[in-house]
């Protein structure tokens, strides 16, 4: 009896009809696809995108060259060189992030004791020339200056959970 039933189901293309029924059910529902460049979905304040270096309100860089972010980076994407200033404090002379190596894990942001390195909400960027994938200190500071209001708002929204 089971063999007869399986022959009837295969002759009537029962699996095909079940698939068409499923397709028909979703054919008239609301679409969930987002056309990305034209439409944007809301982002979380914790989104991890392009990196930026922050400054204090008086304009001084926050980075104290402790090199914790360089040590904690699992992909070895961060390179830091530093020197001592006349007042005895250390400051960075070189701060490079290789975006081809970076896995955007956020460990650098978590390990920074002065909240100097942050990951912004910038997710779409491209490179036209070889070597542009390495962000230098000046570029990172410029990104931090440009998006400081958004970075501060995101940090404030995330503060109760830190």
Swiss-Prot record:
Q: Organism's domain of life?
A: Bacteria
Q: Which residues bind [4Fe-4S] cluster 2?
A: 73, 102, 105, 108
> Which parts form a coiled-coil structure per UniProt?
none
Question: What's the chief localization of this chain?
Answer: membrane
Please tell me whether the keyword Iron-sulfur is annotated for this protein.
yes
Subcellular localization is given as: Cell inner membrane
Biological role stated in the UniProt entry: NDH-1 shuttles electrons from NADH, via FMN and iron-sulfur (Fe-S) centers, to quinones in the respiratory chain. The immediate electron acceptor for the enzyme in this species is believed to be ubiquinone. Couples the redox reaction to proton translocation (for every two electrons transferred, four hydrogen ions are translocated across the cytoplasmic membrane), and thus conserves the redox energy in a proton gradient.
NCBIfam families hit by this protein: NuoI, PRK05888.1-4, PRK05888.1-5
What's the protein name? NADH-quinone oxidoreductase subunit I 2
Q: What is the organism field in this record?
A: Nitrosococcus oceani (strain ATCC 19707 / BCRC 17464 / JCM 30415 / NCIMB 11848 / C-107)
The gene designation is nuoI2
